[in-house]
Amino acid sequence: MAMSSGTLRISATLVSPYHHHHRNRLSLPSSSSKVDFTGFISNGVNSLETQKCTPGLAISRENTRGQVKVLARNTGDYELSPSPAEQEIESFLYNAINMGFFDRLNLAWKIIFPSHASRRSSNARIAKQRLKMILFSDRCDVSDEAKRKIVNNIIHALSDFVEIESEEKVQLNVSTDGDLGTIYSVTVPVRRVKPEYQDVDEAGTITNVEYKDTRDGSVDVRFDFYVPE
């Protein structure tokens, strides 16, 4: 740029550029790095002024024999912390640069053609599956009275075939499955199958053995011994 009273020249110099392989943090250039702007004027006085305008940045302005020089440098006491997303991207790029040719090819293949398992585990599919489970639960939810009737009907049906240990221990459990929806399962403690419905011959078999300590040095033993009629 030409001026009638002199020549104006602006120059920028960066001595120590930021190293891109730094993975942990993002910092300003070191204290030896500088950016200077130099201009020439026809008349001027000798002066030197230093101003620290922002944390980590100092600006010096020098006027010597008609030459104005402005120097901006990093004081080394200020750092910029990257966001988690920037850290992840920087780490990914750093690892990709250090990969071999076949590793890069394999990575590119996985990005372009993701596996079936990766597609299934996507956030959209997970959200859809959860919604499906909630809908199943809403459609299959029953009242407490209905649950008691379910338990009573099951006990009545099983009593024709087995001897139930205790009706009070019968439990109704409700669970949710991703593919099947809401599952109702009933736990019934059974003492034994009734003789007329037994699949094997239990003649002479001892079952339901119980031990009771009498606290006088002896033990009472009770058991069932099946003798067919």
From Swiss-Prot:
Effect of inactivating the gene: Only one or two large plastids (all type of plastid) in each plastid containing cells. Impaired gravitropism of inflorescence stems and hypocotyls, but not of roots. Wide variation in size and shape of epidermal plastids, occasionally displaying grape-like morphology, associated with a disturbed localization of FTSZ1 ring. Severe inhibition of plastid division, producing motile disorganized dots and short filaments of FtsZ. Reduced number of enlarged etioplasts in cotyledons associated with fragmented FtsZ filaments.
Keywords: Chloroplast, Plastid, Transit peptide
Region of interest: Homodimerization: 142-169
An annotated GO BP: chloroplast fission
Effect annotated for changing residue 124 to R: Normal interaction with MIND1
Organs and tissues of expression: Expressed in green tissues, especially at the shoot apex. Also present in leaves, stems, buds, and flowers, especially in sepals, siliques (tip and base), and anthers (mostly in pollen grains).
Phenotype when changing residue 135 to E: Abolished interaction with MIND1
UniProt-recorded Gene Ontology molecular function terms: ATPase binding; identical protein binding
InterPro entries given in the database record: MinE, MinE_sf
Oligomeric and partner information: Homodimer. Interacts with MIND1. These interactions are required for proper intraplastidic localization. Binds to ARC3.
Function, in words: Acts as a topological specificity factor during plastid division and specify plastid constriction sites (such as the Z-ring) in a MCD1-dependent manner. Especially involved in epidermal plastids division in a FTSZ1-dependent manner. Required for the proper formation of FtsZ rings at the division site in nongreen plastids (e.g. etioplasts). May contribute to gravitropism in stems and hypocotyls. Stimulates MIND1 ATPase activity. In cooperation with MIND1, prevents FtsZ ring formation anywhere outside of the mid-plastids.
Protein name: Cell division topological specificity factor homolog, chloroplastic
Organism: Arabidopsis thaliana
